[in-house]
Structures are given as structure tokens and as C-alpha cells.
């Protein structure tokens, strides 16, 4: 069941088996009281400080974080997921969008660079103690009131390649 801290008590009345928190950047400071009999899923924030996270970013812009900054911010979400996970049953899960965003169509060589960098980027993360899942996105994502193009992790072959390269 999707939940935010302010409606947690109301949602617990439905006796869900899983609680999924959709993080915003302020949720790095989220504190929960008590223990929970549910499994925990955290949906990582898509943006931080008004800029999109993009794990395959080809460079920082005024609207997209660099790959290095994105990896750092995702690691913080992983660490927070592990911390909160101690209050839940089972191994916590973190869902992350793979990025590859642009406002305009990119040249095929840039798209291939993004696709080729995804496994190396994920390997830079310490995902020990969490189920780390990349979520495929639709071809057009709606961020900041604009229609962004998702350039990678769209096709079944992208996902199969990722799973084979990471041993999933």
C-alpha cells in the first residue's frame, strides 16, 4: 500500500502486507516510531533540490544532476532505506528510475552511451542489505510540468541485458 508519513496510521487500519513510501528529498530525514509487521518498499525520489536524478546522465544541466551527484543521492536513499528497514520485516526494497532523460531527441550515440553506462553506475552503489530495483519508465515522463523523453531502459532487451550483466 502506498503511504506517506502523515497518513501511515490511517493506512495501517487496512492491515497491508507491504508499505511503499514514495520519497521526496525531505524524506531523507524521515523518522518512524515503532516496529511494523509489514515489508518496506521505498520509491526513490525522482528529483532533489529541484533537479532530476539521472544515473546515466551525460552531464549536469540546470534541470538534471550529473551522474556522480545522482549516484551520491541514490546512495543516501539506499542508506535511509536500510535504516528504516530495521523497523520492518524482511529485506527492504528500493525502487529507482534509471534516468536517461532529455527534453529533446538525442543522437543515437548519446543514447547508447547512456545504455552502456547503467550497469557500471549501479555497481558504484553499495546495495548490500536492500533489494535494489530499476523501474522501467514510459517513453515520455512528466517532470516539472514538461514532457521529458526517457531514452533508456524502455525495451525488453534493455532490461534483459541489464539483468544478465548484473546477475539478476
Stretches found by the model and what they are:
Residues 59-168:
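Active-site acidic/histidine proton-transfer and metal-coordination neighborhood
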Residues 1-79, 165-167:
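N-terminal pre-domain/capping segments
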